[in-house]
Curated annotation (Swiss-Prot):
One of its GO terms (biological process) is pyridoxine biosynthetic process. Keywords: Flavoprotein, FMN, Oxidoreductase, Pyridoxine biosynthesis. This is Pyridoxine/pyridoxamine 5'-phosphate oxidase. Homodimer. It comes from Microcystis aeruginosa (strain NIES-843 / IAM M-2473). The gene is pdxH.
Length: 214
């Protein structure tokens, strides 16, 4: 089947994004938008693109899951030895993007990351399914392996080792919090004249909101 990518287009006309109807606090807006995405029935509405910077200064991006947020920032979990973990440790500048196509909405976030506390990482790790906790031990994330059988063999060994027991959190596994300096909300509109409200964090911790041309 031939696909004409140039002809793929959608008319955005679901909603509008107005200052008069939007909170001055971007975290309140984010919560409202996330709740709407969850109620829409979208598969994994907490999925987001995480962009990092490689040691060579090149951008890298992949999908991850948001696992918590509050006025301090947005939390994700990973293996600290993984490519993204090492990149975030070496260069804390990062960006997140949420795309909810059914709602014709996007959120773009820029900021810097920091490791969350050991206690916070423990609290999340121990609510994960038992086999997911084993998986954190089984995989040396981002390392080259000869085949999947290596992972399956290691998982089987760990199941035997921890049968009937709690699985501890690996010291190399935990969370990062992205502390935002910019949060932009995008709502699709007709004629490609989309609504964009961008919040910029000020030195005193407050937020300045500005409308951007689409």
């Amino acid at each position: 089947m031939d696909i004409s990518i140039a002809d793929l287009r959608l008319d955005y006309n679901l909603e509008e994004l107005l200052e008069s109807e939007t909170s001055a606090d971007p975290f309140i807006v984010f919560k409202q938008w996330l709740e709407r995405a969850v109620s829409s029935g979208r598969l994994e509405p907490n999925a987001m693109t995480l962009a990092t910077i490689s040691p060579e200064g090149k951008p890298r991006a992949r999908m991850v899951l948001l696992k918590d947020f509050d006025p301090r920032g947005f939390v994700l979990f990973t293996n600290y030895h993984s490519a993204k973990g090492q990149e975030l440790i070496a260069n804390p500048n990062a960006a997140l993007v949420f795309w909810w196509g059914e709602l014709q909405r996007q959120i773009r976030i820029e900021g810097t990351v920091e490791k969350i506390s050991e206690e916070e990482s423990d609290n999340y790790f121990f609510v994960r399914p038992w086999e997911s906790r084993l998986g954190a031990w089984a995989s040396n994330q981002s390392e080259v392996i000869s085949g999947r059988d290596i992972l399956e063999k290691r998982l089987t060994e760990l199941k035997e080792e921890y049968a009937g027991r709690e699985v501890p959190r690996p010291p190399h596994w935990g969370g990062f919090r992205l502390i935002p300096s910019l949060i932009e909300f995008w709502q699709g509109r007709p004629s490609r004249l989309h609504d964009r409200l961008c919040y910029y964090r000020q030195e005193d911790g407050s937020w300045q909101r500005q409308r951007l041309a689409p």
